Amino acid sequence: LEKPLPAEWVGKVGFNMEIFPGEFFGKSWLLDEQAGIFPQQPNGPLVNPHGEFLTAPLATGKKLIVAPDADKQRMTIESKTGALELWDGRANHNNGWYIVRGVVPADKTTAALEWVVTPHVIKNWVYEPVIQVSQLGYGAQQPKKVV
């Protein structure tokens, strides 16, 4: 940042990393000493921090482990600066994704947010191809072709 945030922006400006929910429904998460399950339906208490109702964060902490029990989906996000917030963004602005958020502190111009994202890597793993068909549809006599 060229200069610290103006006072009216403090607590509002941050960085969001979004996580596609469909891959994580029913999977667990750990954020420091807190644990939970990624819900299929957005629920939870509401807060009104800046004049608009939002769901409260699912948890706040420094180190998030997403899907610790699933080798193909596990990843770790660790903040070297401030706290991480885990949000269910499906209730906020009809976002549709889970959100990991870090808020930019008031007094920083360099290294305002520093995260380390570590995927779990499975050696020699190869993605299985998915065969698709046209979503536009086919004519009555038109042969169906794999694309």
Predicted regions and their residues:
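Residues at beta-strand starts and edge strands
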Residues: 1, 11-13, 109-113
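Extracellular glycan-targeting catalytic surfaces
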Residues: 1, 115-117, 140, 147
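Secondary-structure transition/turn motif
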Residues: 1-7, 103-106
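Polysaccharide-binding surfaces and accessory modules of carbohydrate-active proteins
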Residues: 3-74
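Short loop/turn segments at connectors of secondary-structure elements within structured domains
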Residues: 9-11, 109, 127, 142
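Short secondary-structure subsegments characteristic of cysteine-rich extracellular domains
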Residues: 19-21, 144-147
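Beta-strand-rich recognition/accessory modules
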Residues: 59-127
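Contiguous beta-strand segments within globular domains
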Residues: 128-146
